[in-house]
UniProtKB/Swiss-Prot annotation:
Lineage start: Eukaryota, Metazoa, Chordata, Craniata, Vertebrata
The name this protein goes by in its record: Krueppel-like factor 3
GO biological process: cellular response to peptide; hemopoiesis; negative regulation of transcription by RNA polymerase II; regulation of transcription by RNA polymerase II
Molecular-function GO term, any one: zinc ion binding
Function: Binds to the CACCC box of erythroid cell-expressed genes. May play a role in hematopoiesis.
Gene name as annotated: KLF3
Tree of life domain: Eukaryota
Family (UniProt): Belongs to the krueppel C2H2-type zinc-finger protein family.
Species, as recorded: Homo sapiens
PANTHER family: KRUEPPEL-LIKE FACTOR 3, KRUEPPEL-LIKE TRANSCRIPTION FACTOR
Position of sequence motif 9aaTAD: 60-68
Amino acid sequence: MLMFDPVPVKQEAMDPVSVSYPSNYMESMKPNKYGVIYSTPLPEKFFQTPEGLSHGIQMEPVDLTVNKRSSPPSAGNSPSSLKFPSSHRRASPGLSMPSSSPPIKKYSPPSPGVQPFGVPLSMPPVMAAALSRHGIRSPGILPVIQPVVVQPVPFMYTSHLQQPLMVSLSEEMENSSSSMQVPVIESYEKPISQKKIKIEPGIEPQRTDYYPEEMSPPLMNSVSPPQALLQENHPSVIVQPGKRPLPVESPDTQRKRRIHRCDYDGCNKVYTKSSHLKAHRRTHTGEKPYKCTWEGCTWKFARSDELTRHFRKHTGIKPFQCPDCDRSFSRSDHLALHRKRHMLV
């Protein structure tokens, strides 16, 4: 009985090859459902004898299918060691197998690092009798029959010899891919991007990123490349008070008087509020929209706060009182001057 490993092998395309055999041998193969056909014709002494050829035996062509890459020929033609090449369809009477048996694999040549193996096969008496008729003597055990494929099998599978190699290769690829996914560069860049600046109390840092469009060109290019590299290498910077005065056009100064500038010729006044700029423009135009409503008073003012202070003269209201004495004032600036006198005494 044939003993084979049921591990599947990879299927390859078949090409038809015609080989001639004796008619009596072909007739003995017809009743069998399964069979093995050799990719290369066996020696003539197996199937052709001088006696058979002299009696006029007719040779018939047989359509066979073999692999494109035929397996290497057998090592020797001795009767005791016989190796059959790649896949076939029909078999001799002694190699018939029942339909319930598992599919027999196709043998693929092992890799250079793997030792070849053989499957011992017991020679049934029917096959021994068939081979003895053609001049072959069998010792009872045929050492190795490498590839045997049964026709009803619809597809082939990969040999089990390649499976350990494929598994080890996939494991190595997984290990290599997992080691390549370590973000080494990002871990070093993140701490550098987070910079802390230590500032002494009483000094406000220059906010150059708030209003970069308002900075003058000399201030934008004031930092030289060596200083920029020094700042990159030393993220912690300590600003000492009193070492350098703030420039005239510093960002803080620009932020306080950045937009509201008088556009009259010869006037360079700048205001932080648009209402103050409007009141200043009235000094150029002479417009005084705020008129006193007190009866008999014709005073007009360009600013509303001026009208408010004027109206307190009519009412006598003095909301600003000194905390050190009982005096009161109608204007806040008058109260500030009075308190300075208390400090000087």
